[in-house]
């Protein structure tokens, strides 16, 4: 969970692509020529182009490889997350991947040999898991899809297959919010915060949609600002209930994918569906990187135990194991790995991503082994 983007560090060379109407993706590129393989990076709540600092390290490490890095702007980028949702995110990821596939036809590498890996940071990890585990195409949702509930509704697109998926800092928004409710914040006591959130939940449940479930309602800005969301960000009742997931763990919201108290049955319906959907092509194609010192994760969470449960749900059928060997906890890593105190942790993150991409590519003559991780 991260809702305040970092300031830009320095000018970054690359190409800006319009992959759909009014939606763009930035391709990090310091050299001419098409690279056949693609890492598509999806950032977290409040993030946008260039706001996740460690992405620069990944780009630098892959400079001499056959991989290019794309960072798309989607409807939920920056402040748009408050009225968007995972379904719309994955729709736009699908459109971006379709664009990239067509764009890279000129790379000289046959389509069957070109690789695409999706990587999510924070809430972007929810997008990644939803992309590879949900029905394809997904089911239409009220308030999110134009024409829902009407005869002439527009169906969500079919999502293209991907060769790999990376989740970095996959944390529970619900449990992060619960920590604030238990401790309060610099402005309000825990008692006041609990009242504000409970009132907001009651309002959102009572007034989730209007106009025959075709339009979202918006929670009053003073309420969401008191909780800690940016005062300028409108948050729909639908998205608020999804993030806070008040009926969890029995009936979790769409965004509640990574909480430590979720049942095995819930994990079978998310992680466990990866092997059934057929969207993630490669075995050993899922890399999960959990930060060892993430302030968004409550102290009571058993990180190692949580990862074991996720792996068990994903790889229950040992004949088709998707969990990659580089998955695990990055010791000492914070949520975003920003700052001078996180240099070693960023190196370790880049090393694991670098090794994973080399395995996905599978050709040592042209793979990431020709590039170099941070030294």
UniProtKB/Swiss-Prot annotation:
Keywords: Hydrolase. InterPro entries: AB_hydrolase_fold, SidJ. Pathway: Secondary metabolite biosynthesis. GO terms for molecular function: hydrolase activity. The keyword RNA-binding does not apply. Pfam families: DUF1749 (PF08538). The keyword Manganese does not apply. It comes from the Eukaryota. Its EC number is 3.1.-.-. Residues 138-158 are annotated as: Disordered. Esterase; part of a cluster that mediates the biosynthesis of a yet undetermined secondary metabolite. With the HR-PKS AN6791, produces a pathway intermediate compound with molecular weight 258. Belongs to the sidJ hydrolase family. Homodimer. This is Esterase AN6793. The lineage of its organism: Eukaryota, Fungi, Dikarya, Ascomycota, Pezizomycotina.
């Amino acid at each position: 969970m991260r809702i305040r983007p970092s300031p830009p560090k320095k000018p970054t060379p690359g190409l800006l692509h319009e992959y759909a109407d009014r939606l763009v993706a930035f391709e990090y590129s310091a050299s001419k020529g098409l690279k056949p393989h693609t890492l598509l990076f999806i950032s977290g709540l409040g993030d946008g182009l260039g706001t996740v600092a460690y992405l620069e390290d990944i780009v630098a490490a892959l400079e001499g490889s056959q991989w290019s890095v794309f960072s798309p702007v989607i409807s939920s980028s920056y402040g748009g997350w408050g009225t968007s949702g995972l379904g719309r995110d994955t729709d736009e990821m699908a459109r971006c991947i379709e664009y990239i596939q067509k764009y890279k036809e000129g790379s000289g590498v046959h389509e069957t040999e070109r690789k695409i890996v999706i990587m999510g940071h924070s809430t972007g990890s929810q997008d990644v898991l939803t992309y590879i585990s949900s029905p394809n195409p997904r089911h239409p949702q009220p308030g999110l899809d134009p024409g829902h509930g009407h005869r002439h509704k527009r169906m969500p697109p079919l999502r293209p297959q991907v060769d790999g998926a990376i989740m970095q800092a996959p944390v529970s928004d619900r449990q992060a919010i619960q920590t604030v409710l238990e401790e309060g914040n610099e402005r309000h006591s825990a008692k006041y915060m609990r009242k504000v959130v409970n009132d907001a939940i009651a309002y959102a449940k009572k007034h989730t949609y209007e106009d025959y479930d075709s339009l979202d309602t918006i929670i009053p800005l003073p309420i969401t600002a008191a909780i800690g969301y940016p005062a300028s960000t409108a948050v729909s009742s639908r998205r608020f209930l999804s993030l806070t997931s008040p009926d969890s763990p029995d009936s979790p919201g769409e965004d509640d994918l990574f909480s430590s108290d979720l049942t095995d049955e819930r994990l079978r319906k998310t992680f466990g569906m990866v092997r059934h959907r057929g969207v993630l092509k490669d075995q050993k194609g899922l890399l999960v990187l959990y930060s060892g010192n993430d302030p968004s994760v409550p102290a009571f969470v058993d990180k190692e135990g949580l990862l074991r449960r996720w792996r068990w749900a994903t790889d229950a059928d040992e004949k088709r194991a998707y969990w990659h060997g580089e998955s695990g906890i990055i010791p000492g890593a914070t949520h975003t790995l920003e700052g001078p105190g996180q240099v070693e942790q960023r190196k370790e993150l880049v090393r694991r991503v670098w090794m994973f991409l080399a395995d996905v590519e599978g050709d040592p003559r042209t793979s990431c082994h020709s590039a170099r991780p941070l030294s």
